[in-house]
């Protein structure tokens, strides 16, 4: 769901589970009901932004009369989602003196304040349908844990490295879907998995392969390793979350899925904070503003990526989602004066090729 749910989780989530009448979205992260606020209850067509056309079909209308959406609108939503997730990640990195777990707790509080009115308005309840509550519980636990690990990765290693590794989520999703959902796992999937692992190795640069050279790293190698494993843990947990959402299908409201994510994530974060003794009061000024914006930007990114896959081909969305990495590179250079190493660039290319290839291949198989 940055991010979350991170960008990687929500991106993979949305691309993996795209259906014509999608109700459920998973980054990644695929299983949640769409949020079409404009179309809700609107019998006619309205003005489309950014194209400005009154005849645009991106607004809700009777299905028999519905036309194709505004050209490029889905890709615009994808880029906007990537930007919002990346800005949220930047704010996580900029917050001073607040542990990643505490940032996760603040995000849960902010999103909870938004989700509760939405659930009341949509009259979906707060528990969920029978038979799905266990899956919702697991989705909440794994999703919130993935968020905590992602924020910890942002704090301990570079934005680019953490984002690239988290982007490998779809590769792990294919493996878990093969194990738990009995989906087909081909030689192509194995190739993409190995290619993604190669990309992660280039970023980690383990000493037994690359020696003791740590040039280009701002943080110590021990901190870099911690952040790297946190990002890998995020990708794995996000992939499990996607599989759970796919198992649930379309029977769970999008906002209800997020509700379990925040209502379980908040006590989880509070318990961890007291165990590790890292609770602290955020500084006045920008830090508190950043904490609020992290929650709002994360929710906005979730909504836009969900809307994007409803009106655009999943393969194109998968390609455009690489903007997450582009924004991470730009922000790392612009705000931290930290130029990514060529190892990171090479690793990013490997991960992008593998995850994009795996997603497009799955989309092509589903369209046959």
From Swiss-Prot:
Membrane topology per record: Multi-pass membrane protein
Pfam families associated with the record: EamA
Entry's localization field: Cell membrane; Endoplasmic reticulum membrane
Disulfide partners: none
Alphabetic keyword roster: Cell membrane, Endoplasmic reticulum, Membrane, Repeat, Transmembrane, Transmembrane helix
Quaternary data: Interacts with STIM1; stimulated by depletion of intracellular calcium. Interacts with ORAI1. Interacts with the plasma membrane calcium-transporting ATPases ATP2B1 and ATP2B4. Interacts with ATP1A1, ATP2A2, KPNB1 and XPO1.
Function, in words: May play a role in intracellular calcium sensing and homeostasis. May act as a negative regulator of plasma membrane calcium-transporting ATPases preventing calcium efflux from the cell.
Protein name, entry field: Solute carrier family 35 member G1
């Amino acid at each position: 769901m940055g991010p979350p749910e991170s960008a990687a989780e929500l991106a993979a989530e949305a691309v993996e589970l795209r259906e014509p009448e999608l109700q459920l979205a998973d980054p990644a992260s695929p299983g949640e009901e769409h949020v079409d606020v404009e179309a809700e209850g609107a019998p006619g067509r309205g003005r489309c932004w950014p194209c400005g056309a009154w005849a645009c079909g991106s607004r809700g209308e009777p299905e028999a009369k519905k036309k194709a959406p505004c050209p490029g609108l889905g890709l615009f939503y994808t880029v906007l989602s990537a930007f919002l997730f990346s800005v949220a990640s930047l704010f996580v990195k900029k917050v001073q003196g607040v542990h990643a777990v505490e940032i996760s707790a603040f995000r849960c509080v902010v999103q909870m304040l938004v989700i509760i009115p939405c659930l009341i308005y949509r009259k979906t309840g707060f528990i969920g349908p029978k038979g799905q509550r266990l899956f919702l519980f697991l989705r909440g636990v794994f999703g919130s844990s993935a968020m905590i690990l992602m924020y910890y990765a942002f704090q301990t290693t570079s934005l680019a490295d953490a984002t690239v590794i988290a982007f490998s989520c779809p590769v792990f999703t294919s493996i878990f879907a093969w194990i738990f959902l009995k989906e087909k796992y081909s030689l192509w999937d194995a190739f993409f998995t190995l290619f993604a692992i190669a990309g992660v190795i280039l970023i980690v640069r383990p000493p037994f392969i690359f020696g003791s050279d740590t040039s280009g790293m701002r943080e110590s190698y021990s901190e870099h390793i911690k952040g790297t494993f946190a990002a890998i843990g995020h990708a794995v947990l996000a992939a499990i979350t996607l599989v759970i959402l796919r198992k649930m299908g379309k029977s769970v409201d999008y906002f209800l899925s997020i509700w379990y994510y925040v209502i379980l994530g908040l006590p989880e974060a509070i318990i961890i904070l007291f165990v590790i003794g890292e609770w602290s009061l955020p500084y006045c000024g920008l830090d508190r503003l950043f904490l609020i914006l992290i929650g709002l930007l994360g929710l906005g990114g979730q909504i836009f990526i969900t809307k994007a896959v409803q009106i655009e081909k999943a393969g194109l969305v998968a390609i455009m989602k690489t903007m997450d990495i582009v924004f991470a590179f730009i922000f790392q250079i612009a705000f931290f004066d930290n130029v990514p190493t060529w190892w990171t660039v090479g690793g990013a290319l490997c991960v992008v090729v593998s995850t994009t290839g795996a997603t497009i291949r799955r989309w092509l198989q589903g369209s046959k």
